[in-house]
A protein has these predicted regions:
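Conserved beta-strand/loop elements of the cytosolic catalytic core of P-type E1-E2 ATPases, chiefly
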Residues: 74-77, 96-100
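Mg2+-dependent phosphoryl-transfer enzymes with acidic/Ser/Thr/Gly-rich catalytic loops
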Residues: 47-55, 88-90, 94, 103-189
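Non-catalytic pre-domain segments flanking phosphatase-related domains
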Residues: 1-30, 175-189
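Basic, amphipathic juxtamembrane/active-site segments
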Residues: 40-63
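Short coil/turn segments at beta-strand junctions that form active-site/ligand-binding loops
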Residues: 24-26, 70, 114-115
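Substrate-recognition element of Asp-dependent hydrolases with the DxDx(T/V) motif
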Residues: 35, 62-86
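Asp-based phosphoryl-transfer active-site loop
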Residues: 22-40, 129, 162
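Feature captures the catalytic cores and cofactor-binding loops of soluble hydro-lyases/lyases
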Residues: 81-84, 99-105
Length: 189
């Protein structure tokens, strides 16, 4: 018996099931390169760390999720000082760098996969995506990651895809943005 080619294994969920799963999420695990960034890596000069760009909208979405009680993990096979600094500035709870087996790294956190949403864009994300309750892929994801996802996002990695995920989860939890005198807050309507 031959295996079905990956391109035919699209995973879809009915809207009600997707909303139920998103409402139950307690941890969102993000791949970094190509998901929180656009996937490009720049080199500024000799001995310099790599240059990565993160979108401010994504950062605000991550803060909103954290303030709503959802834990955040960043999981990357690389080690970049810029990733560490950005994660610290957003108070990311779990920063996992230098791990090729992202699924095993997430399992070490002890959180059941039924409570985890995963956002990935490439082949090394697929095992985590297949295990997660809900898997997202940015618009610019590779075909294997896109096929392994439940939700193909409208925005690209590093250009608002993470914010799109955050807003979907917050809405599934019954929260909506309100303009308050001191800024926008997410709360129950």
């Amino acid at each position: 018996m031959s295996e079905t080619p990956l391109e035919y294994r699209y995973r879809t969920l009915p809207r009600e099931e997707l909303t139920t799963r998103l409402a139950a999420v307690t941890l969102v695990a993000f791949d970094v390169d190509g998901t929180l960034t656009d996937g490009r890596i720049g080199f500024v000069g000799a001995g310099a760390d790599r240059c990565l760009f993160f979108h401010t909208h994504d950062g605000h979405g991550i803060r909103n999720l954290r303030e709503a009680g959802v834990s955040i993990a960043w999981v990357t096979a690389n080690r970049f000082l810029g990733v560490t600094e950005r994660a610290k500035s957003l108070r990311v709870l779990y920063l996992i760098q230098g791990r090729q087996d992202k699924k095993a790294a997430i399992e070490e956190l002890g959180i059941p996969w039924q409570r985890i949403a995963y956002v990935g864009d490439d082949e090394n994300d697929v095992p985590s995506m297949l295990a997660a309750s809900v898997a997202f892929s940015p618009a610019n994801a590779t075909q294997p990651a896109a096929v392994a996802s439940h939700v193909r996002l409208q925005l690209s990695g590093g250009n608002g895809a993470a914010r799109e995920v955050c807003d979907l989860i917050l809405r599934a939890k019954g929260l909506a943005p309100f303009v308050a005198p001191d800024g926008v807050v997410w709360r129950k309507p």
